[in-house]
């Protein structure tokens, strides 16, 4: 179970190394498997905008875990049931969209962490090898709070206004900027090179550096 729980992506990030990843939005299992052999560090399974079901996403997680690539999953929204079920796929990290306030961030972390740090429920899903053997389940519960990456998505001008408060929440590992939604929230849809959009992106990066969060 030790190797099963080890998060190679988080280890690289903690060492200050750059990582390279990609998104998958289609439901083809072969596509996910092929991508995992291309040398990327991680694959983000897009459960927000992608066409795959949660069942298919779970199968993708399993396929990717059989390679040197780390599987990640983006859930549709910051809701406890979606976060819990997403984590039960066994993903090494979860991206949660539209985190606009400190309270949003606190809820996201709470949903991702087991007690006493959070409210994640203990189920016998893929993450714990479907409940057997008991010693390994205990090991997963003990390590998951530290090993599973929590990625908050910053994609609205309100999030930028609150960025220092958001990233001060303990437990956040990565802040991922969504520039298209950011530009739309500012009334500048698609103008990703507009100075105001670029300035907001810079503010997020600066706050990440202050709060020891990976941008």
What are these regions (language model features)?
Residues 36-37, 87, 167-168:
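Non-catalytic positions within long, well-ordered alpha-helices that form the structural scaffold/packing
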């Amino acid at each position: 179970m030790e190797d099963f729980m080890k998060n190679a992506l988080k280890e690289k990030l903690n060492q200050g190394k750059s990582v390279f990843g990609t998104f998958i939005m289609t439901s083809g299992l072969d596509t996910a498997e092929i991508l995992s052999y291309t040398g990327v560090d991680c694959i983000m399974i897009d459960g927000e905008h992608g066409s795959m079901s949660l069942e298919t996403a779970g199968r993708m997680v399993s396929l990717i875990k059989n390679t040197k690539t780390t599987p990640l999953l983006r859930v549709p929204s910051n809701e406890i049931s979606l976060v819990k079920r997403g984590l039960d796929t066994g993903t090494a990290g979860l991206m949660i969209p539209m985190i606009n306030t400190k309270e949003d961030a606190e809820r996201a972390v709470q949903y991702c962490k087991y007690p006493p740090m959070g409210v994640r429920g203990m189920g016998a899903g893929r993450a714990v090898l479907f409940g057997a053997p008991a010693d390994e389940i205990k090991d997963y519960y003990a390590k998951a709070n530290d090993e599973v990456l929590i990625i908050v998505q910053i994609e609205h001008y309100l999030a930028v206004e609150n960025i220092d408060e958001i990233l001060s929440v303990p437990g956040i590992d990565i802040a991922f900027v969504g520039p298209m939604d950011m530009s739309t929230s500012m009334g500048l849809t698609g103008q990703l090179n507009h100075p105001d959009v670029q300035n907001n992106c810079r503010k997020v990066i600066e706050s990440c550096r202050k709060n020891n969060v990976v941008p």
